Amino acid sequence: MDGRSRCDSQRRGFAMYDLPDELPDVALEAGTNLLIAGPPLTGKRDVAFEVLAAGSRADEGSIVVTTKDSADKVLKEYASFVPNMDSVDIGVVDCVTKQRGVGNVRDDPRVKYASSPVDMTGIGIKLSEFLEEFYQVREHERNRILLHSVSTLLMYSDLQTVFRFLHVFTGRVQSADGLGVYVIDSTAHDDQTMNTLKQLFDAVVEVSDDGDGKTSLETAGFPKVE
């Protein structure tokens, strides 16, 4: 994992990011990038949404970059994780709708559209627009950013291209003092791919099914609980 060691429990000058009850009873330093990995249908996205929702409940900003589902679907599903969706300050970078050729969509306060998951330059631009807006206009000093899913990026682009994109993405989260959350289907990629990508992240949550239909979580890179 990343030698930057962003999960230092003694961050100076900036409050820590709290985690939901499902994860260790620790807080993460501003600028941390967290990878959530596991097989399909093990609840990875739910864990990621819970991390995001913990911020929404604390009046933090939330940004979702979706390469798998439309913004409409993301917003509808996220509503079940927060008490009142109308009070949530959220922005979605939709990388799906234009690719599907759905009408003449335009950016609005909650949704910005990239042309496709291949358009990593466009995705980065839309993310930067939201980050600037959330900090300077909406006045959120604390923002959580979710990328769902890294696996979709790897369907359309090679590992080197995705690695470079994520290196810039994670760096942007770090420089903005945000909390980055990234979801990947670990069974869709070989060990070399997974090990290469894990270098970019400060902490990892491995999600699995315990055999009884319940989600099991294993963590690495988190601060020690004292």
What are these regions (language model features)?
Residues Q99-V168:
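Phosphate-binding/switch loop-helix module in NTP-utilizing enzymes
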Residues L179, V183-E226:
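Phosphate-binding/switch region of NTP-binding enzymes
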Residues T42, Y78-P117:
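Nucleotide-state-sensitive switch-loop elements of NTP-binding domains
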Residues M1-A15:
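Short, Lys/Arg-enriched N-terminal segments with co-localized hydrophobic residues
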Residues T152, R164-A188:
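Substrate-engagement module of ASCE P-loop NTPases
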Residues G13-A79:
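Glycine-rich P-loop/Walker A and Walker A-like loops and their local beta1-loop-alpha1 context
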Residues V74-N84, T193-K198:
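Short, aromatic/basic amphipathic alpha-helical patches
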Residues S70-L75, R100-V102, H189-Q192:
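Short, charged/polar "capping" segments at the starts of alpha-helices
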